[in-house]
Structure formats: structure tokens, C-alpha cells
């Protein structure tokens, strides 16, 4: 497959404001690679345009193994590893969790995830998903790492698992999609709330109400690339620079200057994950 690399920054900057330092708290380098994007060249181009820190989220140990050299291509690349609910039906899930634990022991990962519960799709029986989620929460706790949580129509069960885990560093509710009245409960569990490109959709009224309930110091923004492209690019391949459209929408909804939002969200990511990693090659 031919590897594409262009970000089409001329189109992005022609349609919305671009401010260096914008972060992306959640993207999938290996899913982009599977779509024909060379993640190394993509990261180098993002760096040239002044993109801020990024969180590369692996959803299986196999994905994790493919990301080990990526920090050499981008200053400020955080790495996370976990077992996504989409992989909860695999027969070797216990072995996968053991491998995730060994990866975390290397000390080169900034978070555990993506993990969580998905009651919308029957990837595996609920009991299996819950066992895998709880095991990963325990790993996050034992390694003193934040957790990146996927929650699809499983609010109460996610909250109960987080309360039981009592994570020392909380984590991120990725691509938040819960009702507005759930925001406070997740904040109480030490979670940051991250919004993706779907908040730019004009129909996202409830999601926009939830946004307004998030304190400034607990807000994160993401792409979930290559998925969930923001308006007006809905349905097209997503990548981290497209987060600019989400920033513009969020700044408008919150009545905030865009530059102030960029600074605040970057500070929030650093407060949760620590100082951005150096531009050095890492194992994994």
C-alpha cells in the first residue's frame, strides 16, 4: 500500500484557526498506518507545523510493539498501551494482559489504555469485558499511571469500577459521550474529560451541554484519529492536526479566547501525564 503523508495544512489553515501548541490527547498511530498513512512521516510533518504534545494510544500489545521507535520522530509523544474492549473477545486475553504488564514495567509509557467497557457493541460478554477492565485498572494502580477509558453506554459500570479501583492518578474519559449529569461523577473519580470531533457536529446539543460543565483545569481535546473527523470533514480520514476544528468549536462554546484555550489544555495534559517525553527512541 502506498503510504500517504500530506496533512493538507493549507486546507486546514484556510478553514479554521491554527495555533502552534495544540495538543491531541488521543490518536491511534497504528490505525492510521492501516489506512495508508506513514506515522513516522506524519509525526515529522506535525512537528514542522508546531503541533503540541500527542498521546499515541495502542489498543493491543501487537499495536504497542509497532510504536517503539515513534518517539524518535516527534518531540512530546506520550505513549499508552492497553487492551481495548474491541479485543476483549480474543482467546489469549490473559496473555495479552501479562504482556501489557511487562510493557508497563519498562517505564516508557505515560498511561494505560485504551481500556474500558462497551455495551453498545457485543465484543465479548459483559462479565469478560468487566474482568479485563478491572485487571487493567489494577495494573494502572500498581504502576502509578493514569488510565485512558473507553465508555460506550456503560456509565454506571465504568463509575463503579473506577470507584473500586481508587486510582492514584485518575485518568481520561476519552471521547466523552455520556449525559451532562454524569460529568460530576467522573470528575469525582479524578478523571479528566476529553472531547473529540463529534462535539463540532451541529446536532451534538447534549454533548455541548456536558462540555460547559467541565472545569477549565480538567478539560482535554482529542481527535481519536483516524476516526471521528470533525465538521466540516465528517466521514473523511482524520489525523491529529484536525483537532484545530475541535479547538475552534470549544473556544466558541465556552466563550474563551482560542489562545487561552490552547494554553489551558496543554497545561492540563502535562498536569495529568507529566512533562512531555524527550525526542529519544524508546523500546516497547
Predicted features and spans:
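Mid-domain alpha/beta scaffold segments of enzyme catalytic cores
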Residues: 1-284
Amino acid at each position: 500500500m502506498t503510504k500517504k503523508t500530506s496533512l493538507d495544512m493549507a486546507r486546514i489553515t484556510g478553514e479554521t484557526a491554527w495555533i502552534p501548541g495544540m495538543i491531541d490527547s488521543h490518536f491511534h498511530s497504528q490505525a492510521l498506518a492501516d489506512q495508508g498513512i506513514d506515522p513516522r512521516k506524519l509525526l515529522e510533518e506535525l512537528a514542522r507545523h508546531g503541533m503540541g504534545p500527542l498521546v499515541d494510544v495502542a489498543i493491543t500489545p501487537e499495536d504497542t510493539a509497532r510504536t517503539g521507535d515513534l518517539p524518535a520522530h516527534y518531540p512530546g509523544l506520550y505513549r499508552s498501551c492497553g487492551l481495548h474492549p474491541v479485543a476483549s473477545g480474543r482467546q489469549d486475553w490473559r496473555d495479552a494482559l501479562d504482556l501489557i504488564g511487562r510493557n508497563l514495567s519498562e517505564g516508557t509509557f505515560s498511561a494505560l489504555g485504551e481500556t474500558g467497557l462497551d455495551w453498545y457493541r457485543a465484543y465479548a460478554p459483559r462479565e469478560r469485558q468487566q474482568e479485563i477492565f478491572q485487571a487493567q485498572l489494577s495494573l494502572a494502580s500498581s504502576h502509578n499511571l493514569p488510565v485512558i477509558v473507553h465508555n460506550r453506554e456503560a456509565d454506571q459500570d465504568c463509575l463503579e469500577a473506577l470507584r473500586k479501583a481508587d486510582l492514584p492518578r485518575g485518568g481520561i474519559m476519552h471521547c466523552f459521550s455520556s449525559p451532562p449529569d454524569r460529568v460530576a461523577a467522573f470528575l469525582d473519580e479524578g478523571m479528566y474529560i476529553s472531547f473529540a470531533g463529534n462535539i463540532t457536529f451541529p446536532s451534538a446539543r447534549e454533548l455541548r451541554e456536558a462540555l460547559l460543565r467541565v472545569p477549565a483545569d480538567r478539560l482535554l481535546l482529542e481527535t481519536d484519529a483516524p476516526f471521528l473527523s470533525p465538521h466540516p470533514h465528517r466521514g473523511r480520514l482524520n489525523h491529529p492536526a484536525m483537532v484545530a476544528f475541535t479547538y475552534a468549536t470549544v473556544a466558541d462554546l465556552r466563550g474563551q479566547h482560542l489562545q487561552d484555550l490552547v494554553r489551558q489544555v496543554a497545561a492540563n495534559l502535562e498536569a495529568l501525564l507529566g512533562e512531555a517525553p524527550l525526542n529519544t527512541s524508546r523500546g516497547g
